[in-house]
Amino acid sequence: MPSELTPEERSELKNSIAEFHTYQLDPGSCSSLHAQRIHAPPELVWSIVRRFDKPQTYKHFIKSCSVEQNFEMRVGCTRDVIVISGLPANTSTERLDILDDERRVTGFSIIGGEHRLTNYKSVTTVHRFEKENRIWTVVLESYVVDMPEGNSEDDTRCFADTVVKLNLQKLATVAEAMARNSGDGSGSQVT
């Protein structure tokens, strides 16, 4: 359970963590779970996270993302990502595994490309919190991945954790700026 969460948040998120962010690990694989508190409405945060075709909106290390000409965002669709230089990756082909707008759950798998993240699967959930007339969002993101040959579990987790944490921080920055700029606190949504 991420240490960034308050006891109240932990209690409320327990079932979601059990359902979406708990993995049966095969030998040679590892997983991790991260949380990010965002001072913006969950509807706005979800409008960013759900855009499988525009991950560069909040993901740091993506140079570009392309989808098929007649792209339809649905489970099974794919995207081709070009990663910025300096990382141990060049390209990534990713498949949308889940997109549940009602429960605000999305997830993808890396199914090809030039990278070292074999069998990488990620799930992201967006959660609403309200207390004393304040509304905020907690985003949970978890992953499971095979450890590359020659890398330890710590090496693998350190790399993947760094990428996930930086992406979640950028998501918070983008969503909070959108909420501030909307003037009414509800925030505009990504279209």
Question: What spans do the regions from the language model cover?
Answer:
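Short, highly charged C-terminal tails/helix-capping segments
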Residues: 17, 169-191
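Solvent-exposed residues in well-ordered beta-strands and their adjoining turns
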Residues: 37-41, 82-84, 99, 111, ...
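Structural signal for hydrophobic/aromatic residues that build the beta-strand cores
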Residues: 45, 79, 96, 126, ...
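A short, structured loop/turn motif at beta-sheet edges
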Residues: 42-43, 70-73, 98-104, 126-138
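Beta-strand/loop substructures that line and gate deep hydrophobic ligand-binding cavities in soluble
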Residues: 109-166
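Intrinsic-disorder/low-complexity, polar/charged segments enriched in Ser/Thr/Lys/Arg/Asp/Glu/Gln
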Residues: 29-37, 78, 91, 105, ...
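Hydrophobic ligand-binding cavity/cleft-lining segments
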Residues: 1-74
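Glycine-rich portal/gate segments that line the openings of hydrophobic small-molecule binding cavities
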Residues: 50-118
